[in-house]
Amino acid sequence: MQSKLFILLFVASMIFHVRLSAQQDTTVTLKSKASSKALMKDTLDGKFDFSSFLIDAKGFIPVPFIITEPAVGGFGLAVVPMFLTPKKRPPGYKGYIAPDITAGFAMYTVNKSWALGGMRIGSIPAKGLKYRIGGGIADLNLSFYRDVTDKGEKEFAFSVKTVPLLFSLSKKITKQDVYFGLQYFFAKNKLTPLFVDSLPSSIQSDELESNVASLGTFVDWDRRDNFFTADKGARINVLYSANDNWTGSDFTYQKLSAALNLFIPVKKTWISGFRVESNFAFGDPPFYALPSLVLRGVPAVRFQGYTTALVETEQRFDLSLRWSAVAFAGLGKALEQDESFGEAETAYNFGGGFRYLIARAFRIRTGIDIAKGPDSFGWYIVFGHNWNR
């Protein structure tokens, strides 16, 4: 759950981690033609477009968000003031260079969940370094699901007060955009039951007020042609982390996660995307830190286990320069410690939506998805790609 909490806290920072290409000529043309009265129109087709505003605002983006995550009530509002600082290209450097991003974040939802946070995402291209620093505070009302003897699956609602901190640093180790890095995550957590029944046997009372702190190593290979809405390419990320007394954690456990995102241009107007992801927990993690399935239409932490695995596909069909239709579907399983793959319940999702090319110069698409899961519907406002985490 700790990764999901960080997604909720810093969703804007993640989705704005755009990789700006070397198209300086396009940027300059847009800026020279845009007038103060036409900042929201594209110079190419005269349609509504955010590109000139982003350029003329010198990197400042005051972004409002509607939160649609079912786990925190299905509706809420967030404000994300953000600054983007373009990087200078070192001599001989090829490929994309992401801007430095400094962002704040404030949110409130209908189930009285709230969060405040901030994050800095930056790089030193000449040294082949990338870094992330983030922190926040949150009070989230979340439901967890556990099997109870003779009663089947039951919902247990908690107020989750958490103060998370994150730091990561990675170094480019090959010419093929492979980065190796270290990541430290700390969270001070206090969970208060919002139910009158006793705790299930799978939840221990000493887990309700505790610290988790992990030190991890990761490898990241990213050859997508654009972070926001890739038309081709792939990304592979593998992370191993350990929680122990020496890291500052009250628990001893380890996690291993691996993810692949692949984008194939079947046609110029048809982009086929595939996602494969698996997570493993070893040792004795607290119940809220167990891996969970992340699928549209499935509330956060709805399916947890010591092992999770999922596959998902998303097909994008470009109907015109601006408008696209998307369709997606996925399957996943969350396995308990002594549960076989065949015994675990299968979670699924399917749905569709639309995208609008809202910033052509940056290839940013935004839209709405409607998804069906095993026992719920969900709708999501998407900025960039849903898999950007």
What are these regions (language model features)?
Residues 19-53:
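Sec-dependent signal peptide cleavage junction
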Residues 104-105, 150-156, 199-206, 242-248, ...:
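Extracellular loop and loop/strand-boundary signature of outer-membrane beta-barrel proteins
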Residues 1-27, 264:
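Bacterial Sec-dependent N-terminal signal peptides
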